[in-house]
Amino acid sequence: MSLFVTFEGPEGSGKSTQARLLYESLHARRFPVILTREPGGTRIGDLIRRIVLDLQHTEMAPTAEMLLFSAARAQLVSEVIRPYLEQGGIVLCDRYADSTFAYQGYGLGRDLAELRVITAAATGGLRPDITFYLDISAAEGLERKRRKGARSTGQRGANNDEWNRLDARELEYHQRVEAGYRELIAADPERWRVLDARQSIEALAEQIGAIVEPYLASITRLETVL
């Protein structure tokens, strides 16, 4: 058996932190686990990430954006996610296909039926077992990310994930993304686990761990190497 867990949420929701904490917890318990992200996680995906998130690429067409994200996902599924799941491991992914529906579908107004066809091709129909949604309003999440970016060093741009081209869009765009997530959750409630992102990091990590725990009984732990 294997387990595929994804983390979704608006900008500044803390999903990346929670994905990392769950990875560290499972790794410490000797479970076969990897942590990856979208876009990225592969050499090709990381190159695409630089292109789609670069603040200077304001001329990018919505269709190009949608296809680039999907291309990065296709490479990640083929190179990393599917092979590890086939070995019986646990894959934790910071964003997955739901992000494309929320950001490019609802956010940019792309046709959802078209997105379903493209996503099916990119993923081969691979769906997460659990998707955590860290719930915070678009306005509050963006303010969190602005504060975090202000504390970071270095120039904001292609090499800095603290503030990117999608973050820089108007608040109304991010509110459409937030509303889109709620539509996705309502359409598939058994897969989604909605958590209040305004809680402490520790409280969220404890809740996520408790939700994942029942799924671990079927996962074979790694042997201790002496």
From Swiss-Prot:
Q: Which GO terms describe its biological process?
A: dTDP biosynthetic process; dTTP biosynthetic process; dUDP biosynthetic process
User: What cellular component GO annotations does this protein have?
Assistant: cytosol
Keyword set, alphabetical order: ATP-binding, Kinase, Nucleotide biosynthesis, Nucleotide-binding, Transferase
A molecular function (GO) term: ATP binding
Pfam families, from UniProt? Thymidylate_kin (PF02223)
Catalytic reactions of this protein: dTMP + ATP = dTDP + ADP
InterPro entries reported for this sequence: P-loop_NTPase, Thymidylate_kin-like_dom, Thymidylate_kin_CS, Thymidylate_kinase
Q: Which domain of life is it from?
A: Bacteria
HAMAP family per record: Thymidylate_kinase
**Record function comment:** Phosphorylation of dTMP to form dTDP in both de novo and salvage pathways of dTTP synthesis.
Which family, according to UniProt? Belongs to the thymidylate kinase family.
- Name used for this protein in its record: Thymidylate kinase
Annotated source species: Roseiflexus sp. (strain RS-1)
